[in-house]
């Protein structure tokens, strides 16, 4: 029996994400992007910003190991609620691949005649983990 055939307990998983802008250092030689954009869990935001800036001020600037792509782990059948905070001075969003969502409210884009689901402050997205896989 494949994993996706087992009965699953559907639950709601909530994540509060925040967009931060920091210099992103790529390697030990100090190569960096001065305007790096990173999505992090809100509870990690201050620590990541503080530590990344501390390492950026070294000579040469050094990478911080927690500056990496955001990975959210959920189970098949879960409903995923994303509270997305954007304290930056531009409209941003988050878009998922591979999960089901309502394109009118949770697509994370501004396309066609659909309402704009980017934000300059706060928005909540709802996604459904109806497919097993890595996306």
Q: For the regions a protein language model found, what residue spans apply to each?
A:
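Glycine- and small hydrophobic-enriched segments that form the cores of compact globular domains
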Residues: 92, 127-128
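N-terminal, post-signal-peptide metal-ligating segments of extracellular/periplasmic oxidoreductases
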Residues: 1-116
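Short tyrosine-centred short linear motifs in exposed loops/low-complexity segments
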Residues: 77-78, 121-123, 129-135
């Amino acid at each position: 029996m494949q994993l996706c055939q087992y009965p699953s307990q559907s639950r709601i998983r909530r994540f509060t994400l925040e967009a931060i802008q920091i210099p992103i250092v790529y390697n030990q030689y100090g190569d960096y992007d001065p305007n790096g954009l990173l999505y992090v869990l809100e509870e990690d935001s201050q620590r990541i910003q503080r530590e990344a800036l501390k390492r950026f001020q070294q000579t040469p600037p050094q990478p911080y190991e927690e500056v990496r792509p955001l990975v959210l782990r959920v189970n098949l059948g879960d409903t995923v609620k994303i509270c997305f905070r954007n304290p930056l001075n531009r409209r941003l969003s988050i878009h998922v691949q591979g999960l089901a969502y309502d394109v009118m409210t949770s697509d994370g884009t501004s396309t066609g005649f659909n309402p704009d689901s980017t934000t300059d402050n706060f928005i909540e997205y709802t996604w459904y983990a109806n497919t097993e896989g890595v996306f």
